[in-house]
């Protein structure tokens, strides 16, 4: 039996990737296609713009469209996510959130919604990236304070938030594993005369350009050696496939806040 999937943000890059992934996945079926009010796709066939009509009409009426859906997959922007979350909570529809750029208050709103419906919330749905997160924790536990930690990420010119949600997730992972508070020790870029590096800090560097899908490198720099863990995404399909894996996994789960480590059994 296929999972009835609603997709939010079908006009975006990830929206297209999700439409294509659902069409190729025998375990999922497109049930609803949502986009922002005023979108040129509203009223059109969800797949027509990509040359693959699927019989599902794009709508901006979330509450009506979600009735009967078994999961909503959301890759939009924070302000849109909150509206979709509320609609899902009212109808008991599980949610998979791949949107990034949330502040602390936004993450608290997601956690509150997860008390009513199951929510899988992850900055990156890629199986490879989530394995990288696990490897990052192991490396931080083993290497400890003898190694300086730097996180370098690169994305396409259209990405609006920095550092990426994945980079911040890596920062959280190594901070937890090494007994640090990321908010207190993060350094977001350096300029001018900075003085010597504080060994307890975790540095972030951001690159934006071209059509880079997503590159992340975690660097542990010691004296006489360095360890680098790198993941490079060459297609958004990897994120879409991971999101659909989460959409299937969340079926029948109790309300709660989950992440891809739960989905992949990495906890």
Swiss-Prot record:
| Membrane-traversing stretches | none
| Record-listed E.C. numbers | 1.17.1.8
* UniProt xrefs under Pfam families: DapB_C (PF05173), DapB_N (PF01113)
Which positions form S-S bridges? none
GO biological process terms held by the UniProt record: diaminopimelate biosynthetic process; lysine biosynthetic process via diaminopimelate
Q: Where in the cell is it found?
A: Cytoplasm
**Pathway(s) it belongs to:** Amino-acid biosynthesis; L-lysine biosynthesis via DAP pathway; (S)-tetrahydrodipicolinate from L-aspartate: step 4/4
Binding-site residues for NAD(+), renumbered to this chain:
9-14, 35, 98-100, 122-125
Give the active-site positions.
155 (proton donor/acceptor), 159 (proton donor)
Which GO MF term does the entry hold, naming one? NAD binding
User: Can you cite an annotated GO cellular component?
Assistant: cytosol
Report which reactions are catalysed by this protein: (S)-2,3,4,5-tetrahydrodipicolinate + NAD(+) + H2O = (2S,4S)-4-hydroxy-2,3,4,5-tetrahydrodipicolinate + NADH + H(+); (S)-2,3,4,5-tetrahydrodipicolinate + NADP(+) + H2O = (2S,4S)-4-hydroxy-2,3,4,5-tetrahydrodipicolinate + NADPH + H(+)
Please give the function described in this protein's UniProt entry.
Answer: Catalyzes the conversion of 4-hydroxy-tetrahydrodipicolinate (HTPA) to tetrahydrodipicolinate.
Q: What is this protein called?
A: 4-hydroxy-tetrahydrodipicolinate reductase
User: What organism is listed for this UniProt entry?
Assistant: Thiobacillus denitrificans (strain ATCC 25259 / T1)
Q: What gene name is given for the protein in this entry?
A: dapB
